[in-house]
Structure formats: C-alpha cells, structure tokens
C-alpha cells in the first residue's frame, strides 16, 4: 500500500495555531500518513514538493497582516509547481478583528491555488483556542485531505 506523506507548517504567537497544527498532524497520523510538522520561519516552502498533502496553519496579525516570520515562505510558495498535490489551510484567529478575522487563511488558500495544487478540504477558521467543536472540525478537515489525496492515486 502506498504511504501518503504530509507536511504541516504553522505560524503562531499565542500557541493556538501550533495547537491547530498538532490536531491536524495527529489526525493525519491516525489515518496512516507519514507527517512532518514544522514552524514557518524554519521551513523552506519547496519542502512541500516532497509531500502528497500540504497544510498551512497560520495566524492573522492585527488588521489582516500575514505573519512577518512567514512572508518569505508565502512569497516562495506562490512560485512553486505543486501540481498533483493536495492542500489545506486552517488557522486560529480572533473574531474581535471583524472583517480581518483569519484573512491569512484566505491568502494562503489563494497562494496554493497559484501552485496548481488541488484543495482537498474547505479551509477552516477557528476562533481563539480550539474547543471540542473545533477539534472535530479539524479532524474532519484532515480526513477530507486524506480522502482527496487517496482518490488521486
């Protein structure tokens, strides 16, 4: 049987997006994937070329800004050719920011689409720390990513 590989990249200030990444990683592993989880400033976007499933879990800073430590990653991601890959984006934010709530999720989704990768699950936006409902949503997100990647095999 073919082993799916996944790479989960996160950016966090409060720890919430690392929690999001950990939840996704754990579910992917439970589903039989070989998973690498890394922090965005320590990751070269080109590492996604080695994975079947590519995931970003990142925060939105202030009024809609991408994480400073993830700007190079974001720019490099857009230049990659990820045809044949499955991607997903999730993030924790704060609804206090209104129209800017979790906009980084939207930016990374758009960046992935430029690479030719296929979206394997609807992006997930979590308010603050993941509660049980959010964990269930993230588990479903991970399951959808695996199902999408398996269907492409």
Residue ranges of model-derived segments:
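Short, surface-exposed acidic/glycine-rich loop or hinge patches that mediate macromolecular interfaces
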Residues: 11-15, 42, 60
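FMN-binding flavodoxin-like domain, especially the glycine-rich phosphate-binding loop
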Residues: 16-19, 27-31, 50-153
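N-terminal amphipathic/basic-hydrophobic helices that include classical n-h-c signal peptides
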Residues: 1-2
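Short, flexible active-site loop motifs that bind/organize anionic cofactors or intermediates
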Residues: 7, 38, 128
């Amino acid at each position: 049987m073919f082993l799916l590989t996944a790479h989960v990249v996160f950016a966090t200030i409060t720890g919430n997006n690392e929690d999001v990444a950990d939840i996704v990683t754990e579910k992917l592993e439970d589903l039989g994937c070989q998973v690498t989880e890394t922090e965005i400033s320590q990751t070269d976007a080109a590492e996604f070329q080695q994975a079947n499933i590519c995931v970003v879990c990142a925060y939105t800073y202030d009024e809609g800004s991408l994480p400073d430590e993830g700007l190079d990653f974001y720019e490099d991601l857009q230049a990659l050719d990820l045809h044949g890959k499955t991607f997903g984006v999730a993030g924790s934010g704060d609804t206090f920011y209104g129209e800017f709530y979790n906009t980084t999720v939207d930016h990374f989704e758009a960046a992935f689409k430029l690479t030719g990768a296929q979206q394997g699950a609807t992006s997930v936006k979590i308010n603050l720390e993941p509660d049980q409902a959010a964990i269930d949503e993230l588990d479903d997100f991970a399951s959808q990513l695996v199902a999408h990647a398996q269907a492409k095999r």
